[in-house]
Regions:
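Bulky hydrophobic/aromatic content
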Residues: 68-139
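Short beta-strand-centered aromatic/proline hotspots
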Residues: 147-148
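Short, basic/aromatic recognition patches that contact phosphate-bearing ligands
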Residues: 1-79
């Protein structure tokens, strides 16, 4: 991996997490989270797409943003949903750079790994974004037969 400034590395990780788990990345997210210009956000996306995960994001005019290609594989993050959930949970008004930064000497309790497919999370995010409803099936340990 090329030598990067710390802030750039954090933005590239955010690009990967958002694209992987939300299925859509827009420059506005990076601008708001990191306090950067649209040109810088576009430059970071282009850099990710040419230097780190070549041609893994394509611009989609229908969604007005970048979407991951079929078979997208994260290269800067582990690909576990916990990274994405931690990013969302700990944002709480903080600049995203502080959220994604590792804090040496500080330990936190990690959520157990979950077997979650990005496609499922993307549909949930899309429903939240568009105000749509989802039809789901639920099964519990005490009642393993799925029901709506």
């Amino acid at each position: 991996m090329p030598a990067l400034k710390h802030e750039v590395h954090l933005r590239l990780r955010a690009i990967e997490l958002i694209a992987h788990w939300e299925g859509r990345l827009i420059t506005t997210q990076l601008m708001e989270w990191f306090g950067i210009t649209r040109q810088q956000a576009s430059s970071d996306i282009n850099r990710y797409n040419t230097e780190f995960n070549v041609q893994s994001l394509v611009h989609n005019a229908a969604v007005k943003g970048y979407v991951p290609v079929t078979g997208f594989c994260p290269v800067l993050t582990s690909g576990h949903v916990n990274e994405y959930l931690s990013m969302l949970a700990s944002q709480g008004g903080q600049p995203m750079a502080q959220v994604l930064e590792a804090h040496p000497g500080v330990a936190t309790v990690q959520l157990p790994d979950r077997a979650v497919r990005p496609e499922v999370v993307r549909e949930l995010v899309k429903a939240c974004r568009t105000g749509s409803s989802l039809k789901t099936l639920y099964a519990s340990m005490s009642s393993p037969i799925p029901h709506e």
